[in-house]
Amino acid sequence: MIPLGLGEIAEIVGGKATGESVTVTAPAVLDSRQAEPGGLFVAFAGEHADGHDYAERAGRAGAVAVLGSRPTSLPTVVVEDVRTALQTLAAHVVARLRDGLTVVGVTGSQGKTGTKDLLAAVLSGAGPTVATTGSLNNELGVPLTMLRAQAATRFLVLEMGARHEGDIAELTGLVAPDIAVVLNVGVAHLGEFGSRAAIARAKGELVQGLVPGGTAVLNADDPRVASMSVLTDGPVLTFGRTDPADVQVLDVVLDRLGRPSCTLRTVDTSARLALPLVGAHQALNASAAAAAALAAGVPLDLATTALTTASLSPWRMELRDLACGATLLNDSYNANPDSTRAALDALSAIEGGRRIAVLGEMLELGDGSEAEHRAVGAYAAARADVVVAVGEAARPLADGAGERAVVLAGNDAAVDWLRDHLAAGDVVLVKASRGARLDEVAAGLA
């Protein structure tokens, strides 16, 4: 966050400053527990909780001011629409920094967060980098990330998600990216969009939102993504296994823990890369990150060096040894059919004893939800010795898995069952949509 006085913030967002004059020097937060000294607490009045009631707690944590819809115990900028004010403030801050800043937007049906993490690791070696924390990729998370940018920031990496057409266009209206990375068009949020064509149109909004002359970085393996090249007059870089992708993935080999080594090849050079991440799909994510880095001026050799030590956000393909001698693969943050298949492929590639897939409901799949769950269940049964379906909503997974399935009522029952049945050498995958909270199962085993 660049230093801004309370009155200046009020002027930027069209609000009224109340309380003593203070200067905000630290990032904005929505959670009072995450406030930092000198920070701005953004208070929303929701149906079940009113953020304004937590202003004092935010102050104790170090926040010096509040952006809200009514005065609080802290100096406050009062506005009619807090969301719009937050977005306006973020757009203003980035506009002031824009001359020295390269903005990268990342979207796709799956792999956004992992690719964003890889790209941030690469760009951090080339200059001060601010990137989305976790999956804060919506109309609130993106401006919060933008407000973390400072005068010294050289790269701003923004994960951009969507549940409806127009969502990403709204985000690029706040900050037009210099580089737009589109990973894939899958079935995540199909229930909200209604069709893959609608999902493709939504993801394409990132390309359409590029600054004039900005670079689109597109997956050559996904025809829906590759066709987005017509949405821009600027340069296009491609990545993938397809020949001739601009950054091509070749010779993928997995070690005993399912971690890929591969060659990334461009027209000018190539580099061998060993990723410290689980899953063959990480090689494709790495090629996307390398292509985006090339667009940002980072050469392939520096990108691959950085990728060898990259790490992912929590609860994403985390490998951990358990006290019982089993191995936990925690990918519990979120799930859709495509990402679950990738995780199951990773599970099957890890050497060990039995492979146990603990799966929960995949949300927002619309009318095809039951069929998608059955199909993933069958896919799991071909790659795991036991498929544990957690919760009644996950029963179609068990139906698809057939005789390999175990159905358990909830997370506590899953923890109890696993504690009773896990043995040394077993490998257990935990994965579901965020709403299923299967991170509780992973935590219960750790």
Curated annotation (Swiss-Prot):
It is an enzyme of class 6 (ligase). GO terms for biological process: cell division; cell wall organization; peptidoglycan biosynthetic process; regulation of cell shape. The keyword Hydrolase does not apply. It is found in: Cytoplasm. ATP binds at residues 108-114. Pathway: Cell wall biogenesis; peptidoglycan biosynthesis. Pfam families: Mur_ligase, Mur_ligase_C, Mur_ligase_M. It catalyses: D-alanyl-D-alanine + UDP-N-acetyl-alpha-D-muramoyl-L-alanyl-gamma-D-glutamyl-meso-2,6-diaminopimelate + ATP = UDP-N-acetyl-alpha-D-muramoyl-L-alanyl-gamma-D-glutamyl-meso-2,6-diaminopimeloyl-D-alanyl-D-alanine + ADP + phosphate + H(+). InterPro entries: Mur-like_cat_sf (IPR036565), Mur_ligase_C (IPR004101), Mur_ligase_C_dom_sf (IPR036615), Mur_ligase_cen (IPR013221), Mur_ligase_N (IPR000713), MurCDEF_CellWall_CoF430Synth (IPR051046), MurE/MurF_N (IPR035911), UDP-N-AcMur_synth (IPR005863). GO terms for molecular function: ATP binding; UDP-N-acetylmuramoyl-tripeptide-D-alanyl-D-alanine ligase activity; UDP-N-acetylmuramoylalanyl-D-glutamyl-2,6-diaminopimelate-D-alanyl-D-alanine ligase activity. Its EC number is 6.3.2.10. GO terms for cellular component: cytoplasm. The keyword Signal does not apply. Keywords: ATP-binding, Cell cycle, Cell division, Cell shape, Cell wall biogenesis/degradation, Cytoplasm, Ligase, Nucleotide-binding, Peptidoglycan synthesis. Belongs to the MurCDEF family. MurF subfamily. Involved in cell wall formation. Catalyzes the final step in the synthesis of UDP-N-acetylmuramoyl-pentapeptide, the precursor of murein. This is UDP-N-acetylmuramoyl-tripeptide--D-alanyl-D-alanine ligase. It comes from Streptomyces toyocaensis. The lineage of its organism: Bacteria, Bacillati, Actinomycetota, Actinomycetes, Kitasatosporales. The gene is murF.
